[in-house]
């Protein structure tokens, strides 16, 4: 009887001010755009997150073996009109940690909605707008990808290194596209590279002929496309190729995946871009594990998704054994030095050390380390199309 009472008391203490849950129902949400503009990259992201959850459950060490992690998929559609429905799902399922969202707008809606209301930490593997960190007044938002101000700077430096002197730019008319375009443009202008024109692309606009005409008239050695392959990106490249105005494309992270290869292949040889990631032994180790579990590793944010789930699981473990009601502090603790390094496939090791009261430093697939704002420092992989395939050139 005494053990039963203590168990019940723990469950209330564990959740603190968040939400009540029943025994054996530690639930985290994988809130990503399974349909909509990110639907081609999200399945692998979700599978990677589920892989981390599976590792924790298989260990039988999570929360002293008393609980399992239950993960549920929430389709955000990457559409801000869906925010109310997403927040309702989070609340109804008593979710205590969120992996996501994939897109900035819906991430903002969750952060200012259910996350803020219930004190639920969220770790996004792909939302890059710096605005999210500024809106986070309760230290609930983290990301395992890097903010877009760095994306734009790094991509601009690669462009300059390739000797490109004149560039036409097109960008999605959203926070994601605007931030990327702003920082890309500023870095290149400071380096005396000419931006011939900068054209916003309205989401799902039926006819892009005017935008393509403006880009073609301005000209340049290359054209930058900062959107998503399913959301106007494919149509934009196709229209530009048909116009004959450009042969070289500078691509944002959400344009780099198998869909782009399959659709255009050798037609965009020598085009290039970046994705968040590294070529260290950590990511290579993760890729081996992912491939054994039939996860496609060719797209962006795969390692970041695995790491987001792993960090939440490990933070929950530390919270349990330290009787700490602030999960955000545990997220910072397990992800940053000092502590025993934890690499891909070693979640069970991390859980075991935390059970013993030891400090860990989760490195994971992408060398996770959060700054005071919850942003990852991160690195990038330069990708270039050669023989119709995206090839990694170097780490930046």
Functional labels for PLM-detected ranges:
Residues 1-4:
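Positively charged n-region of N-terminal signal peptides that target proteins for export
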Residues 6-10, 19-396:
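Extracytosolic ligand-binding ectodomains
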